[in-house]
């Protein structure tokens, strides 16, 4: 069996989204497992919607996920160029060859004529199919025209899909579709076939929304006289309501998840499990995925995207990292929020306590910004815990911390336990007022962690401010 040559061919009309990223991942894994080649091709023929910004975002997203390409933009390869708009001569040459051989023909029908036929079909409540008006017209390249592919009148086209099994499409359900517009730009099916032929792609892995294109493309391969590649159509990714995945389900671009603080290995890990499994194992490194992944194990049932589950996977990966590793990853997120964090012992301590509590690096910032910014007292917490009755408690805690020669864990813990014992109350009666004073709210890591991270000077300053406002309205 030849080594696989697979491709990912996104359209740069938007960012790299979840479905596209999984398609790229499955192809990349198959190529890497089998010593094959992963080709990146940019299908930019929609000139009105394609942008360089989107191209850059797609490349950036793939790099962030760790999906390097062997041929394509930025790395070259033996079958350039890798942008469709730079390959128009190829499409024209293949279309003209099909015309010469009677397998395609020039269609001179005007848009107005076709629109009238569509309206008539609609009025008669039947599906419009091009009636082959120009099938036998002589070719006159001087007349404005498009090129249509001549679909065989009888029979069916079948293929054995690696994921979905045997699929057959009767030819009488197809029409003579346009393959080349008047401006020389190919339509999707023809452009993909010519590119896959000239780039020697032997396995086409893509979403199963392309199943209906496959018979048309196989007919084009056969008409051009080239081997038909193997096809694998991956199941769709749906939202929780079983509708097609969209932003309202929490799905967004891959780079947006990066900016929210997801790790690339977590996103890869979650995406691969949307349609593929290996026993009961949940977490995989990229190396493990390359070792285990097999297209035969991709299911035909649609996967359901669950942002909470992806956050859980991300949390599991975060917990595998050391505070030192987490600090380097979290630092850009703190700085992006305008917080004066540094890659130092303070941030490493913050990450150590955040690791069990927060599921994304973005949540590190949301939950623990009070270590780097002035606190905003929660009104309900202030009213309940910063009162005239708790002012003496706060003062006692403040004085005890001020007297400590160093903020050793045991010594800081003893400040709170000792004050609770002295007053004959539970620890919460001492710790909660101090927690509100130091963090602004009622949920935080242990008080010894909070005090150590803030440092003595900032701890005393915040306690002094809490003592000042305790019992005051507002």
From Swiss-Prot:
Lineage: Bacteria, Pseudomonadati, Myxococcota, Myxococcia, Myxococcales
InterPro entries (alphabetical): aa-tRNA-synth_I_cd-bd, aa-tRNA-synth_I_codon-bd_sub2, aa-tRNA-synth_I_CS, aa_tRNA-synth_I_cd-bd_sf, Glu-tRNA-ligase_bac/mito, Glu-tRNA-synth_I_codon-bd_sub1, Glu/Gln-tRNA-synth, Glu/Gln-tRNA-synth_Ib_cat-dom
Catalytic activity field: tRNA(Glu) + L-glutamate + ATP = L-glutamyl-tRNA(Glu) + AMP + diphosphate
Record's cofactor remark: Binds 1 zinc ion per subunit.
Binding annotation for Zn(2+): 107, 109, 134, 136
PANTHER family hit by this protein: GLUTAMATE--TRNA LIGASE, GLUTAMATE--TRNA LIGASE, MITOCHONDRIAL-RELATED
EC number: 6.1.1.17
Enzyme class: ligase
UniProt subcellular location: Cytoplasm
Bilayer-spanning residue ranges: none
Coiled coil: none
GO cellular component, one term: cytosol
The protein's name in its UniProt record: Glutamate--tRNA ligase
